[in-house]
Amino acid sequence: MKKIMLTLASALMLFSLVSCKGKKADGKVWVVATDTVFRPFEYTNEKNEFVGIDVDILAAVAENQGFKYDLQSLGWDAGVAAVQVGQADALIAGATIKQSRIESGWIFSDGYYNATQTFVVAKDSTISSYEDLRGKTVAVKNGTAGMDFANSLKDKYGFKVAVFEDSPTMYQDVILGNSAACCEDTPIMADNIKTGGLALKIPEGMESEGAPYGFAIMNPANQELLDMFNAGLKNIRENGTYQKILDKYLK
């Protein structure tokens, strides 16, 4: 009888532990890192609200899938590092899905936006082709598809590359004349010129073919979050929410 009672008590204890574990999982808050300024994907508006395409897509996906998250605006390099060391579970920051990133351990979601990269010059610049960059300097943001695009052309067209840690500083380097051009994701650049009044312009014919942005994790233990993102992304595409978000920021 005592043995039966002990077995029953053990079973009840196990049930209690499993129940508590389930409740803890249900209340999990996923930590998601993002950039500080990558308009229109993430930025602080005039009301001091952190907004953008990435911000709204994540919110819509989380609502659709019923998970909680803590979005932390850390900056690109700090956000990447946070995921790499496990201080954040995922990254959403206009991260281009690239083979080199996959090989280094990043695990990406389905693409949620296809972006091209473009060269950008000062408003009064006469540069209109890659050939015009010979002997000059092109500014890029560290770790971005824009940097990759510029590096893929620098030897062929004979220009140097200067690396910056954030987009605003990179833009200013071109405006001040230190760099002849910069290379940035096209939607980002178009929005910054339009809304920020930057004395920059986008020459025709100096644009890449483009690649998709993805939500990314590094720890395979966070696959559940990635699966929920993919499922939610599919649903918000189908119900029209996704297009409404794009229209809100890109039109």
Describe each model-derived feature in a short phrase:
Residues V29-G52:
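Short glycine-rich His-centered loop
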Residues K68-G75, G158-D166, D173:
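Short beta-strand-to-loop elements that line the ligand-binding cleft
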Residues V55, A59, E63, K68-D132, ...:
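Acidic, polar ligand-binding/catalytic clefts
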Residues T36, Y113-V121, A190, K194-L233, ...:
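Periplasmic-binding protein-like
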Residues T34-F38, Q72-D77, G86-Q99, K123, ...:
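Beta->alpha turn/N-cap motifs
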Residues G22-D26, K68, A145-A162, L200-E207, ...:
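Ligand-binding clefts/hinges and TM-proximal coupling segments of bilobed small-molecule sensing domains
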Residues S16-S19:
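C-terminal motif of bacterial Sec signal peptides marking the signal peptidase cleavage site
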Residues A81, G94-E103, N151-S152, I175-L176, ...:
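A ligand-binding cleft/hinge motif common to bilobed small-molecule-binding domains
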